[in-house]
């Protein structure tokens, strides 16, 4: 039995309503898509204030009011037509579009799947005018200068599409994410958000650093690096999060091109590559970056959502972004946004409130109290906090009076910059005094070692105050950079072992050692089979000669077996070198004398990106004299 041939249907043009609904399938994917399109229109109209009202996650209602230029009365019906816009009028303007919107299909697409009412007023109008999309009726209305777009009952006429919507909270989350992107891109615009009649978010117009802290929270604000780079027509600015601010998800990655939020694989790869020396594994960097370039150098007419772009010279853009972020991470050594930062409030300030010195002190005490489980002082914790929160603030001082009697480095060592090489190591019972760095802090920014704490940390003094160094993490970074430099130059020095280290190996490990012998030679290893079940390590890189040879060999063979020789050297090189450096770095409880500690500090100063270990953790932190004064409540 054969299936009946369906009757041929004639070719005919589709009705405008159906065309708009088809287009809406791409433009209006969910309530968040409506929010995005309306926010872009408001910003293109010059709005500086945005009021957003949502109901039931935006499914029942989305109303956005702006104070932009408004729409003239005679243009209101045209605004609801498909492909009607004031933003472009020729192909030349399309190729150099500088506005967020330009297609002229958003309002028509939204009106085809929801009940839309548009109310607008220009500065020349005596009153506002309203148009109802479903009927086309135009009538006078109340309202100030600007525009209100009220969208209700999304997908009321396409129930099949409505079934694909998620829960109210999920849709609300997507709407808020779009609003957050807008808030980060335009800190000069005040934004308020209400959901189901209750206030949800409010951001006053502010500087970029304050807006970023308000939107992304104090955790990111305390670990961000502000920077700005320019090269020719390219300019990149914003905030790159320190590796310590990395996250398990890529939910704090915001990249803007000419003010437009984009998701571009080229840009994401450039930023990720810049972090590869300090962030391995499954962690994602956090950042808010803005790229500016001539509009004609980027094509934004790639996808209906306008979230994808193409660059005229993609290679140049990639290299510029990569080097700019990499330089920012290298340049801000030691600025790890540690927990003693007091310039970022834990909660947003009330509108119009001005912080006083006493407020700053109280905030700092509250932050410290939240981190301390107990206080090693006589009075009870509650009484102490009550006393401190009611106390006066310390007066700022760049150099307290009590430091006037501290001898300088020149006086302490009769003009010598450091202790002689043949000086006897300091005894634990009476440690030698460390040279004090001069105020310029140029020669030795990490200062000079004073003591070792618990066999883990090196305590040093510099012109700013006190430096704490994690000696294992710091040594790990030094070894990593030396290994990386040697591998790039194909000059890894090899240390033959007087007695080869043998160990039982699996058939896979033995096969890997035989297959990737050339790669092992390049890495500085001599690993070969001495029996069907035994491998021997006869040489290791000189930099790693103190490490466990068996553990090193197993790690290298595991990576080679998993990824192959060429991929290990191309894509997994940094991870492999980080593992090797970790094996050979100085371990905890290794006692160092002052000469060894100072040698570590000098190596750190000469090493690129020495402020972060290979896993993204800080290698040192700076506590200024002002920080120490606050800890001991001096000057209050």
Swiss-Prot record:
Compositional bias of kind Low complexity: 417-437
Annotated region described as Disordered, given as residue ranges: 332-360, 417-443
Listed InterPro entries: DNA_mismatch_repair_CS, DNA_mismatch_repair_MutL, DNA_mismatch_S5_2-like, HATPase_C_sf, MutL/Mlh/PMS, MutL/Mlh/Pms-like, MutL_C, MutL_C_dimsub
Domain of life: Bacteria
Alphabetical keyword list: DNA damage, DNA repair
Pfam families (alphabetical): DNA_mis_repair, HATPase_c_3, MutL_C
PANTHER family per the UniProt record, alphabetical: DNA MISMATCH REPAIR PROTEIN MLH, PMS, MUTL, DNA MISMATCH REPAIR PROTEIN MLH1
Protein name: DNA mismatch repair protein MutL
Organism from which the protein derives: Ralstonia nicotianae (strain ATCC BAA-1114 / GMI1000)
Source taxonomy: Bacteria, Pseudomonadati, Pseudomonadota, Betaproteobacteria, Burkholderiales
């Amino acid at each position: 039995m054969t299936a009946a041939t369906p009757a041929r249907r004639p070719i005919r043009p589709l009705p405008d309503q159906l065309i708009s609904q088809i287009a809406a399938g791409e433009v209006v994917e969910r309530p968040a898509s409506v929010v995005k399109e309306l926010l872009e229109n408001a910003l293109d109209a010059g709005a500086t204030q945005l009021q957003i009202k949502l109901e039931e996650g935006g499914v029942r209602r989305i109303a956005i009011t702006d104070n932009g230029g408004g729409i003239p009365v005679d243009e209101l019906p045209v605004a609801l037509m498909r492909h009607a816009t004031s933003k472009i009028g020729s192909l030349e303007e399309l190729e150099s579009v500088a506005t967020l919107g330009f297609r002229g299909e958003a309002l028509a697409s939204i009106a085809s799947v929801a009940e839309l009412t548009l109310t607008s007023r220009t500065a020349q109008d005596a009153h506002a005018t309203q148009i109802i999309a479903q009927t086309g009726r135009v009538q006078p209305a109340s309202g100030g200068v600007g525009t209100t777009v009220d969208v209700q009952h999304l997908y009321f006429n396409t129930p099949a599409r409505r079934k694909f919507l998620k829960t109210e909270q999920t849709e609300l989350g997507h709407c808020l994410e779009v609003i957050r992107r807008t808030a980060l891109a335009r800190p000069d615009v005040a934004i308020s958000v209400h959901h189901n009649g209750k206030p949800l978010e409010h951001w006053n117009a502010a500087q970029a650093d304050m807006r970023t802290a308000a939107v992304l929270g104090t955790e990111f604000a305390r670990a961000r690096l502000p920077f700005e780079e320019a090269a020719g027509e390219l300019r990149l600015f914003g905030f790159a999060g320190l590796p310590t601010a990395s996250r398990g998800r890529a939910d704090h990655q915001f990249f803007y091109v000419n003010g437009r939020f984009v998701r571009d694989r080229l840009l994401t790869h450039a930023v990720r590559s810049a972090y590869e020396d300090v962030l391995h594994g499954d962690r994602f960097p956090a950042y808010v970056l803005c790229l500016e370039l001539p509009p004609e150098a980027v094509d934004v007419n790639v996808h209906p959502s306008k979230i994808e772009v193409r660059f005229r010279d993609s290679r140049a853009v990639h290299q510029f972004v990569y080097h700019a972020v990499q330089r920012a991470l290298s340049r801000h050594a030691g600025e790890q946004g540690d927990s003693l930062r007091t310039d970022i409030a834990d909660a947003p300030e009330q509108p119009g409130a001005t912080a006083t010195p006493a407020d700053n002190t109280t905030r700092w005490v509250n932050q410290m109290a939240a981190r301390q489980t107990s206080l090693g002082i006589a009075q009870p914790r509650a009484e102490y906090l009550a006393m401190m929160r009611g106390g006066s603030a310390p007066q700022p001082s760049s150099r307290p009076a009590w430091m006037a009697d501290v001898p300088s480095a020149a006086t302490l060592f009769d003009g010598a910059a450091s202790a002689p090489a043949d000086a006897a190591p300091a005894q634990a019972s009476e440690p030698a005094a460390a040279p004090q760095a001069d105020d310029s802090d140029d020669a030795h920014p990490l200062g000079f070692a004073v003591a070792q704490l618990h066999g883990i940390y090196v305590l040093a003094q510099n012109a700013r105050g006190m430096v704490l160094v994690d000696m294992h993490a710091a040594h790990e970074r030094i070894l990593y950079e030396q290994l990386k430099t040697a591998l790039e130059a194909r000059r890894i020095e090899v240390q033959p072992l007087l007695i080869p280290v043998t160990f039982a190996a699996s058939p896979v490990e033995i096969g890997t050692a035989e297959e990737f012998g050339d790669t092992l030679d390049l890495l500085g290893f001599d690993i070969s089979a001495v029996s069907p079940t035994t491998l021997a390590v006869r040489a290791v890189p000189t930099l790693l000669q103190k490490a466990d040879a068996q553990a090193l060999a197993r790690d290298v063979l595991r990576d080679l077996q998993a990824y192959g020789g060429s991929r290990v050297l191309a894509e997994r090189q940094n991870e492999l070198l980080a593992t090797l450096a970790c094996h050979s770095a100085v371990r905890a409880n290794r006692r160092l004398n002052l000469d060894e500690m100072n040698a570590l500090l000098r190596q750190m100063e000469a090493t690129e990106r020495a402020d972060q270990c290979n896993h993204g953790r800080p290698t040192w932190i700076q506590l200024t004299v002002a920080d120490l004064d606050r800890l001991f409540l001096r000057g209050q």
